[in-house]
Curated annotation (Swiss-Prot):
The keyword Mitochondrion does not apply. Residues 29-38 are annotated as: Acidic. This is Envelope protein US9 homolog. It comes from Cercopithecine herpesvirus 1. Residues 1-63 are intravirion. Pfam families: Herpes_US9.
Length: 90
């Protein structure tokens, strides 16, 4: 078994490596500074509302996906049933 060796700088960075120069941008609603007129409690209330909206949107998307999947299964089932009837009675 070969001993583990530490990665050197050349193996970590290559010509195709992409290193972001700035951190990923946050949504403008998700910041809090003491200099704002907003208190910490107001910030937490706002973040709670945002998280509730995100959860609601996720739930609605999941429900729409289930409905679409159910409709697709029903259409496939109906199509196969029609095909079987057509093949059986022709």
């Amino acid at each position: 078994m070969e001993p583990l060796r530490l990665a050197d700088a050349e193996s970590l960075l290559s010509e195709t490596s992409v290193i972001p120069l700035t951190p990923p941008a946050q949504t403008p609603e998700a910041y809090y500074t003491e200099s704002d007129d907003e208190t910490a409690a107001d910030f937490l209330v706002r973040m709670g509302r945002q998280q509730t909206a995100i959860r609601r949107r996720r739930r609605q998307t999941r429900a729409a996906g289930f409905v679409a999947a159910f409709v697709l299964v029903a259409l496939i089932s109906g199509g196969l049933g029609a095909l079987m009837c057509w093949l059986a009675y022709r």
